[in-house]
């Protein structure tokens, strides 16, 4: 495929910058746009696992990722009264094996953005409309600007606006796994030292984690609920929903809820998967969570984003045209996506226990997780491009 192709990439999180790196590497002309005024800093910890580690090494970022990795030394399980039940040390609590690594989301975004400093990147650029033609796509931005591109690739996340513009409701389905997640920063008032402490009971999980910055910690909530619509988008309702589910739940729950309004990085979402037969239509493609999020519970969203970006760019490099490249992208990535989405469903059904786990029960569950995860994280053989 001619490498002079002008390609618009939408979304400056994980998949978007990774895709731009590979497109630029292969001689294409990518432009990256992001609707927000900057990349999001900080955030929760994410993982590079399985073959995604190989992609990171090929990109030359693996050493940088390792240098910025989290450094949790233990995970402590407590009961509702705050009594220590047991603790795990090293990588065991994070389900990482071999050269797999955990890093804060914002740190990985910074590393990826540093690989594409020579690529045009525009912030505060939201898309108003996309119009496909035989030989190009016309993009109307909300700031009034209009541009034509040979291809458009959207990496704008689970709630992708591009997906809603381009694909009909018959083309995709958001599968709610019946769980919800929330994360926000708090002062490290428990003075945790490279440690995560958590309470898992009544199909709910509350955690406090402090890693590199000893003054700061992150509060985490995960829970099952059938009493909410799939889509709660306003922050006030999200916080009310958390209070309904965690007030007087035990341990530090009430304290964390009281600190919630002071956080400037509050995050909440339903745990969902994007289910699609194909991630392409005409001259437009989806990559990462926009097309195939496996759910945060799987811990594989970042890995799917990196692998998906690698394969999509590689197929565009080797194919005769975008039609052939998109067809191969859909075909090659499908088994990997399906394996990791199945893993995400299994986790949603197997975690968030009714009663606090014993050390033996946690050990048994961890071993099962590691076995299933190893298969899912290697459910594709990386092509060489």
Swiss-Prot record:
Cofactors, names only: FAD
Regulation: Inhibited by anhydrotetracycline.
Annotated keywords: Antibiotic resistance, FAD, Flavoprotein, NADP, Nucleotide-binding, Oxidoreductase
Biological role stated in the UniProt entry: An FAD-requiring monooxygenase active on tetracycline antibiotic and some of its derivatives, which leads to their inactivation. Expression in E.coli confers high resistance to oxytetracycline, slightly less resistance to tetracycline, moderate resistance to minocycline but no resistance to tigecycline. Degrades tetracycline and oxytetracycline; the reaction requires NADPH. Degrades and confers resistance to chlortetracycline.
Family: Belongs to the aromatic-ring hydroxylase family.
Note on domains (UniProt): Consists of an N-terminal FAD-binding domain with a Rossman fold, a substrate-binding domain and a C-terminal helix that bridges the 2 domains close to the antibiotic-binding site. This last helix is flexible, is not found in TetX of Bacteroides species, and may contribute to their different substrate specificities.
Annotated protein name in UniProt: Flavin-dependent monooxygenase
């Amino acid at each position: 495929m001619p490498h002079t192709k002008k390609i618009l990439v939408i979304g400056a999180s994980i998949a978007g910058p990774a895709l731009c790196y590979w497109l630029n590497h292969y001689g294409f002309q990518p432009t990256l746009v992001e609707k927000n005024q900057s990349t999001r800093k900080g955030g929760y910890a994410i993982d590079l696992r399985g073959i995604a580690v190989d992609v990171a090494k090929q990109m030359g970022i693996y050493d940088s990722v390792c240098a910025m990795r989290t450094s949790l030394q233990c995970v402590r399980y407590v009961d509702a009264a705050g009594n220590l039940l047991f603790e795990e040390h090293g990588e065991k609590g994070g389900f990482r094996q071999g050269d797999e690594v955990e890093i804060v989301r914002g740190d990985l975004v910074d590393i990826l953005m540093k690989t594409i400093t020579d690529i045009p990147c525009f912030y505060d650029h939201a898309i108003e409309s996309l119009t496909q033609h035989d030989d190009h796509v016309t993009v109307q931005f909300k700031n009034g600007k209009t541009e034509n591109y040979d291809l458009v690739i959207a990496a704008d996340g689970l709630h992708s606006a591009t997906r809603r513009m381009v694909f009909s409701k018959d083309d995709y389905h958001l599968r709610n796994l019946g769980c919800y997640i929330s994360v926000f920063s708090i002062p490290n008032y428990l003075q945790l030292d490279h440690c995560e402490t958590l309470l898992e009971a009544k199909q709910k999980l509350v955690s406090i984690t402090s890693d590199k910055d000893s003054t700061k910690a992150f509060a985490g909530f995960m829970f099952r609920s059938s009493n909410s619509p799939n889509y709660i988008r306003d922050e006030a309702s999200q916080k009310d929903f958390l209070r309904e589910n965690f007030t007087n739940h035990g341990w530090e729950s009430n304290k964390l809820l009281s600190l919630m309004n002071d956080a400037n990085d509050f995050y909440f979402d339903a745990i969902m998967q994007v289910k699609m037969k194909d991630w392409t239509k005409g001259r437009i493609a989806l990559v990462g969570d926009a097309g195939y999020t496996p759910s945060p519970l799987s811990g594989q969203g970042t890995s799917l984003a990196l692998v998906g970006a690698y394969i999509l760019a590689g197929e565009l490099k080797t194919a005769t045209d975008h039609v052939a490249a998109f067809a191969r992208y859909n075909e090659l990535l499908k088994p990997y996506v399906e394996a990791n989405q199945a893993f995400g469903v299994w986790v949603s059904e197997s975690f968030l226990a009714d009663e606090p786990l014993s050390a033996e029960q946690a050990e048994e569950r961890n071993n099962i997780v590691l076995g299933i995860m190893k298969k899912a994280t290697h459910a594709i053989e990386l092509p060489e491009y």
